[in-house]
């Protein structure tokens, strides 16, 4: 009897994994069709290629996406602004068509952005960064204040308030999870683990094409502000900053953001009781605040 039960359970599990594999394959194919609709462009830079979306007119917002991102997520973060501003949305190192320069540090990523802006004939930008992209945007603002009009951070990585005695050398998912099928299987747990809807998986696919970037973020980008604390003199920032964060964010600590805000000169901090890491439900408030921030510095 028990052998029949065990066999039935095994068969049910096997069928489940097969069905999920079929669903995952279909979702990956659809994700590649979705990416094609962005009409992304590729520029040859000194170290390799960078792929980006360039849409809209007016003041320029350079969108710096987070982990599991790419030009698609970089653009989608700013799509509500496309009718008013020019959006430059590149894939960062290792994501969707963008090569890695050197060790892939935030400083190298910022330098690549400058090279892209030079190629596009753009002098100054507002930086808008989400999550892991915050380290790169902050690095850009510190290294190139003459190219930066303002810094906007959405539930972003934040610098520690003092040099940490220890920190995570690897801050991200282990490489074996950076796989279309494995992450698709885990997506029903997104709400519990990350506070995100299961459907978020569809904006992350194809994960196999983002894996290099994810591992680079986990090993280099995310630990950088702790590892090289002295290289991030936040108090010396020469540009204004606008920071958004939700108190129920499960991925980027709201408490750490509250502490870090005091380090930013000329900073506006807008917090939300809810919304999670994606600031769900606050599109209108964010659009108004960002528009006011950009317009104040466009004259």
Predicted regions and their residues:
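Alpha/beta-hydrolase
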Residues: 171-173, 177-232
